[in-house]
């Protein structure tokens, strides 16, 4: 079990990568770090691995993880290959410095190469490999020796779309197998589909901040902020409205005068927001398409299981093609966010999620 106790990272020039984090990662758990470039994913992995200094404590089974280097394997984003050495040398080197004998090294190197499908390239220089095989060479290190924690940094980054898909289909089952053996797996990715496919929990990151930690279901149903919601639904809708109590229930009045019934949130909103401007947010598949505020559909196209209807800056998911569509949320589907920092103003989320 890994325990993060008040862990954060601040550089000498003052930039803080993420605020103090408390988190427990259980044996056999797969955790995805999801975020765009410069969101702090790599720094998070390096802090956990102990290869960069940080504030707070990173403990593994009660002891500092940095003092257990043999328990951790990290596949870096830059792959850290010896470009002018053979693939064989790249795999043999970490075993050699740990004192393995020649026969043992040969056996493990060839077995690891076979696992990832680069046996035919073992004696080529690493720089001669194409992009996807360089990634496979780096991944092969996971099969060289036993470990308890695997840290994998954005392994499909820089590949063409089809190559990235192919590589992930090869890597994902291996990571799942490691987890079934009780190993902890933490991987970074920019691709929400990769995160969703195998992660037990997801850490949503953005611009050096951790926006939310939770299961996919938790994040979709109760996003801590608009960014966390948009991480899985790029068309997540939000608009400014004035929050008030009317007719004995919670209501939000939009800037164009329409009222959104928020009775499902009665008693759940931080009280200081009553009478204030807020953001009302809802998922792109939660529009009341037959509702009273209609907009003309400018474009429509069929996706995998629905139509995507474009109305101005809105993209509405709908079961059928229409000429006009409602642009307010379905009853019971709207959530509320601060209109300045975009954080949730629902009291249970605010209380549960404090970084």
State the predicted function of each range.
Residues 1-4, 8-20:
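A short, flexible loop at the N-terminus of ABC-type nucleotide-binding domains that lies
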Residues 49:
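Helix-to-loop junction immediately C-terminal to a conserved catalytic motif
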Residues 56-68:
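Conserved ABC transporter NBD signature motif
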Residues 145-146:
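Conserved signature/switch motifs of ABC ATPase nucleotide-binding domains
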Residues 207-208:
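Conserved ABC ATPase "signature" C-loop
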Residues 246-355:
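Non-catalytic connector elements of ABC transporters
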């Amino acid at each position: 079990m890994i325990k993060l106790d008040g862990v954060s990272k601040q550089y000498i020039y003052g930039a803080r990568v993420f605020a103090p984090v408390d988190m427990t990662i259980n044996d056999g758990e797969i955790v995805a770090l999801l975020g765009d470039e410069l969101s702090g994913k790599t720094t998070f992995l390096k802090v956990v691995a102990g290869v960069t200094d940080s504030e707070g404590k990173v403990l593994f089974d009660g002891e500092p993880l940095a003092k257990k280097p043999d328990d951790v394997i990290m596949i870096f984003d830059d792959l850290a290959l010896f470009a002018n050495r053979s693939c064989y040398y790249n795999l043999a080197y970490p075993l050699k410095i740990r004192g393995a004998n020649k026969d043992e090294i040969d056996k493990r190197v060839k077995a690891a190469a076979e696992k990832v499908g680069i046996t035919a390239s073992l004696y080529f220089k690493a720089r001669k490999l194409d992009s996807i095989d360089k990634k496979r060479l780096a991944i092969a290190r996971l099969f060289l020796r036993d470990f308890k924690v695997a840290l994998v940094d954005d392994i499909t980054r820089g590949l063409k779309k089809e190559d990235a898909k192919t590589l992930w289909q090869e890597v994902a089952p291996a990571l799942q197998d490691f987890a079934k053996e009780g190993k902890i797996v933490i991987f970074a990715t920019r691709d929400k589909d990769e995160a969703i496919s195998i992660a037990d929990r997801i850490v949503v990151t953005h611009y050096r901040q951790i926006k939310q930690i939770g299961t996919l279901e938790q994040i979709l149903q109760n996003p801590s902020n608009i960014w966390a919601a948009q991480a899985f639904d790029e068309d997540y809708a939000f608009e400014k409205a004035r929050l008030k109590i009317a007719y004995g229930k919670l209501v939000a009045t939009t800037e164009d005068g329409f009222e959104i019934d928020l009775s499902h949130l009665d008693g759940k909103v931080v009280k200081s927001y009553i009478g204030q401007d807020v953001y009302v947010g809802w998922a792109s598949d939660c529009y009341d398409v037959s509702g009273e505020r209609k907009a003309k559909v400018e474009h429509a196209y069929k996706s995998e299981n629905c139509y995507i209807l474009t109305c101005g800056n809105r993209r509405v998911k709908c079961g059928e093609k229409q000429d006009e569509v409602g642009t307010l949320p379905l009853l019971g589907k709207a959530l509320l966010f601060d209109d300045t920092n975009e954080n949730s103003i629902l009291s249970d989320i605010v209380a549960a999620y404090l970084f």
